[in-house]
């Protein structure tokens, strides 16, 4: 037996107990006649003491050779600690060591294994197995495990069945590029790694597995951002014989359950807003509603004056920033420079100070009087002491720019408290979106999403106005889940493929198996998928998902620890019938 207890469980009630511990040397303090060693494992730290007057000489001398991160086993007696440490659970005791075994030595780590380390991100990713020993990373992985267990418990209690679906599937157009896997036994043919288990979970519904879930790896070969990984994990769910309301209720319940069990928070409100309302009011379809600053459209009050910039704009829109009326000109100019950055792309910005006496001071006083600006204040719900910032230009582009400014200001003003949680549903998404370059419509979610029955007639005349039975769950400005009611009959699915530009032959080649299944009695069904990585990061109060993934990739999609991806040798390429052009 390597250990009778772990390094986080012993306390004063264990005094005089003989114990065996094993772990890593965190640090040691050699005072000549006395040597203290902090022994660490996943559960905590226990102090060991080697006393020249009470410890066997051989053991005492061996303890002096211990280095950082040596793996050791000790046997000894729990005794009361003279200098108690109230900051750790084991701070009342220490172990008077009688036996010491060095299980493995260790090189000096390239960074300190401490909560606050001196290692940069690159070196910590290269030695990720060492980084996992640090409390912040270890605790993030344990936190992820707890969330996953609560998900399984909640769904299992509702009679959901966890079913695994294949990882080697057929490449189909789902939006992002597929990762492809060559088949040695089928020359010139390839599998793809799934971007989601979408078609398989629909086939499970046809198969009668009416409540399915899976915590599953998915893969997308796309350009990476700080919050994206080429492989990611979904809480994937599907239900048969349900309407949209049934699905929203189940997964609203899951979210409430997680917030209560993980964070101890009861959620009172769970608003539902339409996609159109979200875009008009917040400028994006995943609004952060922990704070206000709703958009106020100002065309009616700002145009038809003498200010040519607003007169030429498709949209004039502003937000009221609480308490920002005392911003200096330097601070305002800094914000103007911020919105002019290429990442935002605004050409300029107008500001209005809402004075405490009910008057207004703006950068366009030459064109607008106090009564005009009072109307702007009313439209943006501005109060005395606030500042109104106004952008103008093409409607969609301007809303996106103001949305970016809204989020930046909320961050600067401390309005995005990571311990406050404000979930909501966004519903009634457009079924299709137009690609302006190709002139073709694309499915906003995926081609299996059903249109709202009352909008079916619009498919022939105004396809861009057709609404989908689709819904996203948003938490603190992040889309954490999305889903839809699916098409479950062949005729409607064929019609959808037609509007997406598929020929009959292409649709059959790509998705014939699904349409065939629909002919054998497919039930009405729908589902949803949560992004587990993003969900645990938000619940854990962190900005990046990497901290919650054991072995993440970097921003270039590389695993620098194992140096992947990597070339394969010519023999493997030949066996796979692959020839690589010169690079």
From Swiss-Prot:
It catalyses: tRNA(Asp) + L-aspartate + ATP = L-aspartyl-tRNA(Asp) + AMP + diphosphate. Its main location: cytoplasm. L-aspartate binds at residues 174, 220, 445, 486. The keyword Protein biosynthesis applies. Transmembrane segments: none annotated. GO terms for molecular function: aspartate-tRNA ligase activity; ATP binding; nucleic acid binding. GO terms for biological process: aspartyl-tRNA aminoacylation. Its EC number is 6.1.1.12. It comes from the Bacteria. ATP binds at residues 220-222, 229, 479, 531-534. It is found in: Cytoplasm. Keywords: Aminoacyl-tRNA synthetase, ATP-binding, Cytoplasm, Ligase, Nucleotide-binding, Protein biosynthesis. Pfam families: GAD, tRNA-synt_2, tRNA_anti-codon. Belongs to the class-II aminoacyl-tRNA synthetase family. Type 1 subfamily. Catalyzes the attachment of L-aspartate to tRNA(Asp) in a two-step reaction: L-aspartate is first activated by ATP to form Asp-AMP and then transferred to the acceptor end of tRNA(Asp). Homodimer. This is Aspartate--tRNA ligase. It comes from Flavobacterium johnsoniae (strain ATCC 17061 / DSM 2064 / JCM 8514 / BCRC 14874 / CCUG 350202 / NBRC 14942 / NCIMB 11054 / UW101) (Cytophaga johnsonae). The gene is aspS.
């Amino acid at each position: 037996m390597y250990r009778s207890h772990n390094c986080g469980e012993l306390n004063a009630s264990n005094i005089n107990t003989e114990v065996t511990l094993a772990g890593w040397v965190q640090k040691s303090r050699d005072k000549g006649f006395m040597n203290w060693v902090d022994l660490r494992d996943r559960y905590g730290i226990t102090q060991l003491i080697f006393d020249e007057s009470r410890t066997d000489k051989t053991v005492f001398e061996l303890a002096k050779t211990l280095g950082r991160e040596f793996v050791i086993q000790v046997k000894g007696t729990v005794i009361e600690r003279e200098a108690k440490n109230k900051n750790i659970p084991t701070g009342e005791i220490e172990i008077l060591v009688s036996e010491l075994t060095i299980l493995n030595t260790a090189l000096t780590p390239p960074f300190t294994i401490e909560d606050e380390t001196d290692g940069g991100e690159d070196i910590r990713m290269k030695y990720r197995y060492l980084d996992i020993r640090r409390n912040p990373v270890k605790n993030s992985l344990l936190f992820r495990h707890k969330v996953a267990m609560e998900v399984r418990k909640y769904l299992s209690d509702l009679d959901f069945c966890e079913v695994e679906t294949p990882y080697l599937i057929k490449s189909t157009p789902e939006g992002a590029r597929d990762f492809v896997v060559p088949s040695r036994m089928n020359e010139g043919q390839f599998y793809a790694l799934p971007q989601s288990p979408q078609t398989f979970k629909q086939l499970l519904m046809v198969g009668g597995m009416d409540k399915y879930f899976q915590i599953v790896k998915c893969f997308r070969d796309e350009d990476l951002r700080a919050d994206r990984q080429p492989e990611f994990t979904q809480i994937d769910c599907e239900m048969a014989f349900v309407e949209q309301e049934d699905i929203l209720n189940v997964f609203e319940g899951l979210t409430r359950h997680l917030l209560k069990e993980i964070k101890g928070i009861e959620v009172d409100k769970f608003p539902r807003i339409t996609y159109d309302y979200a875009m008009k009011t917040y400028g994006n379809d995943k609004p952060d509603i922990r704070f206000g600053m709703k958009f106020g459209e100002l065309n009616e009050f700002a145009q038809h004056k003498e200010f040519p910039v607003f007169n030429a704009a498709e949209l004039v829109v502003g937000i009221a920033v609480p308490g920002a009326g005392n911003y200096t000109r330097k601070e305002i100019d800094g914000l103007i420079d911020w919105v002019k950055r290429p990442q935002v792309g605004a050409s300029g910005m107008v500001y209005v100070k809402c004075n405490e006496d009910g008057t207004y001071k703006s950068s366009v006083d030459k064109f607008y009087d106090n009564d005009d600006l009072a109307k702007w204040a009313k439209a943006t719900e501005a109060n005395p002491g606030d500042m109104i910032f106004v952008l103008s230009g093409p409607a969609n582009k301007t809303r996106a720019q103001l949305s970016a400014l809204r989020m930046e200001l909320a961050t600067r003003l401390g309005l995005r408290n990571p311990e406050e949680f404000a979930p909501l549903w966004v519903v009634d998404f457009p079924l299709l979106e137009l690609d302006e370059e190709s002139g073709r419509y694309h499915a906003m979610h995926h081609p299996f999403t059903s249109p709202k029955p009352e909008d079916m007639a619009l498919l022939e005349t105004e396809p861009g106005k057709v609404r989908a039975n689709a819904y996203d769950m948003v938490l603190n400005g992040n889309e954490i889940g999305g889903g839809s009611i699916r098409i479950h009959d062949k005729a409607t699915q064929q019609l959808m493929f037609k509007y997406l530009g598929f020929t009959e032959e292409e649709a059959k080649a790509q998705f014939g198996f699904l349409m065939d299944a629909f002919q054998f009695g497919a039930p009405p069904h729908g589902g949803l998928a949560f992004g587990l990585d993003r969900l645990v990061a938000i619940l854990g109060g962190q900005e990046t998902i990497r901290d919650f993934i054991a072995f993440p990739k970097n921003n270039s999609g590389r695993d620098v620890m194992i140096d992947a991806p990597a070339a394969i040798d010519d023999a493997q390429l030949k066996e796979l019938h692959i020839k690589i052009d010169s690079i």
